[in-house]
Amino acid sequence: MDSKITKYFLIIFLINFKVLAVEFQGKFIQGHYIIGKTSPGAKILIDKKKVKVSKDGYFAFGIGKDRKFDIVITENEKKIIKKIQKRKYKIQRIDGLPEKKVTPPEEFYERIKKENLLIGKAREIESDLPFFKEKFIIPVDDAIITGVYGSQRILNGIPKWPHYGLDFAQKTGTPIKAMNNGIVTLAENDLFYTGATLIFDHGHGVSTLYMHMNKIFVKVGDHVKKGEIVGTVGSSGRATGPHLDIRLNWFGERLDPQSILAN
């Protein structure tokens, strides 16, 4: 009789333990995007920072491009420590750019500063939208990937910031699809570096950027559906040819877009 009671309580404990255990989707690699699943109502901290948890227990976070130390996830009072796998990034050389777009003249500094603030504001939005946990799709059909995340860019022989996006080369005018459901939080036709640019909010601090477009078909506040045509491929801003440069952000953390397409 005692053994049956013991077995009963052991089963109950294991069931509860499974419910409380955090599950992760994604790889703990530099630059990657992670989706977590916990019990509804649980409190989650990422490196002591509280993150939003959806009503059904989902949350999201990102791992920085050059992060070298472990990441600490706290579920209620339980700590989970994950080691981060390092990556080796490529070197990419791009020649033939107009000199003013490699090293912009001083008269453009104020404009660039204002545009960076505009983009930064859109990236810091923390909404309750649930789309961050859904599958993302490739935005351009039959494209060639010509630039990857993390590559060190040497522009006209001058070392510059790493590339934080994923480039899809296609003909000017090729349709661009929304990678996921979301709300348009930025729609600008002529930013200095990125040209015609869109930002979509997918919820919980997760946003995607579309850059160097030719035409934009949506406006700020529009609700877009996954697969909807939102514009066309172009070469606006600082670009040497027609392509779409996509970015993935978790708030201010710039992540590898391939990590959401892989998920």
What residue spans do the PLM features occupy?
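Solvent-exposed coil/turn segments that connect beta secondary-structure elements
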Residues: 39-41, 49, 66, 85-87, ...
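Sec-dependent signal peptide recognition
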Residues: 2-12, 18
